Amino acid sequence: MGRRMLLIAVGGLGLGRGLGQEMGAGTKPDVTIAPKSTAVVSARVIDAANEPAISAQEKLQLIRRRIKYVFVLFQENRSFDFYFGSYPGADGLYAGPSGPYASGQVAGFTQAIVNTDGTLGTVTPFRIPATVTDTAGKTVPLYPADIASVNHSHVATARKIALDADGVAQNSEYALTEEGVTLVDGKPSKVPTLERKQFGELVMSHVDCDTVPFLWRYADRFTLFDHFMDTIVGPSTPNAIAMIAGQGGETQWMLHPDAATTGGIGMGATVPMLSDPQPYWGSALDTAQQLKQPQALHTFGGVSKNLTFASLPLSFMGSTIKKTTARDYDPAFDLPDVQEDIEKIAGHGVSAVNWGWYQQGYDREKNDPDAKATHDGYVAHHNAPQYFGYVANNPVATTHLHGLSDFFRDVAAKQLPASGVFYVRGGYGNIEGWKPQDPNPRLATVFNGNDDHPGYSDSQVSEALLAEEINAIASSPYWSQSAIIITYDESDGEYDHARPRIRSYDAAGLPLEQGPRIPALVISPYAVAHGVSHVPTEHSSVIRFVDEVFTLIPLADLPDEERGREIGKKDFGQDYLGPADDKVPGVGDMSSAFDVLRLQGKRAPLSAAYAIIPKREIDAFPHDHGDGCRVLGITPTDSGLPNPVPSDFNPRPDSTPGIPTAGGWTP
């Protein structure tokens, strides 16, 4: 009874609070236009306030008429503030849509950090410089495109956001959590090593348009979302699953309470998902002889349960759902928790929706040495559909799972179906053979990943992949009917000042949903040019957009998911356990990114050429010669402010240890 009483005590707190305390939520338009840009961009800008006033339903009908393809370019592990914290016009570290922030206005801006001598100091956000000067006067390059990964476990992230007694995130424990230190009466529990202190500094860092000019170019030309949150407080796998399910398994937890987890990596066989286990399908536990799914060469974190709650791949089956699920190899194992969902989807009268999940290394890639797939770049715990038996254990459903090379081949050959939803992911290494700028030969094989995950991916290699994907779409007939959504699974545990709104808690009473802020952009011929959307959004908003465009029943309205939610209300005092594509306040959709005049045909759509980045620029590292802000004509909001880089800062404390300014450090 004690655990349930805890959940009742905290479950209703925080909702409706903390969402926009820096942003002034509810006091500004959904979309504003960023400060003046180049002539190329300015010529395509219309003040959002001058758009025709139409109802949400009228706008949705226009979107349905124009958009037939939704592409989700799904990257890894960056906070919004890390990439866009100094983007003009957004709710950033130094300024918001209305101008600079006053001291103390940004949550967690100044954080405690313990020095290696045990004294207490502070750290504030800073931009990672391209170079520093060491004690001998030598210029030392830091290569900010290659940084270590900080702690993004469920427990660590819950500590970092630091809820107060009212359930409002203070975002004040990022540095101390990285150090592994707590303060008791102002005194540290232990003295951190140099490496741990450097991680405490790294978590507060950010970059700008000099490091990721392609990302800023897309934000400049199309629509950036400055309040898009991840769904689960925690790592990649639960948030990959949330991208297609709107939850991490809470309804499965409610239907099977003995499956609850208290968190911690290695405890994979539990729901809701809170760690990064490998999918059950393809693991050593999967003894089925049919449809053996691939596993990554590098595995950790145990093995997941078979996930049995509803997701978009189930909804995508549409009116053919009974015929499709009849092909499942083990329906008693895969389908018991969605029987009523299947009936409702079957009776909805909507045809099956085409879809595809394209992920590097899932099958043979173009850089594999022979006809056999090596799966060398495959990160299995990023492949959300592989966790669901009704996909991975069904010969019809698995035809929707592909490798990354397949995406480029299918788009170039015009082999996509007449409409649909398509997810695209990178992984370890990259199929183009791009090398990070850092000349260290060891790091060339450590940071050559293309999915943007710190610790193994290079930021510019990763934005190069995005550019190749967008170019492929823009060069195809699909461009004129497309909505391209770039977003991330989670924040990697990097500092972000926007307060997540906590609506649910796990079995241990730790915050479960929603998590920290992450980048999100919409690119489309019908997008608001140079816009910043301030609509509260998250992974479920992408699902909601897909629901709306393809007239699907929201996952939250399916009967088995409703049953799980009702158990959460009745037995655990929590109202919002389950999908958030409906019935959860404060979760908007992605429609604010679309220009009404363009949708109505009264203003020219944005051209494919406007979206394309030339191949020669993609292949030239560093992008824009490391001078992206000047090339783009953008002045970051920290321009002219002191950049308080800690004297012992190191962007890669684990792979290139030491102090760059001390002399003798190898990047």
Locate each region found by the language model.
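N-terminal secretory signal peptides and thylakoid transit peptides that target proteins
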Residues: M1-G11
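Hydrophobic membrane-targeting alpha-helices
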Residues: G14, G18-E22
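Terminal low-complexity, poorly structured segments
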Residues: A9-G11, L15, G628, T637
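N-terminal pro-sequences and low-complexity stem/linker regions of secreted or lumenal proteins
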Residues: G24-P667
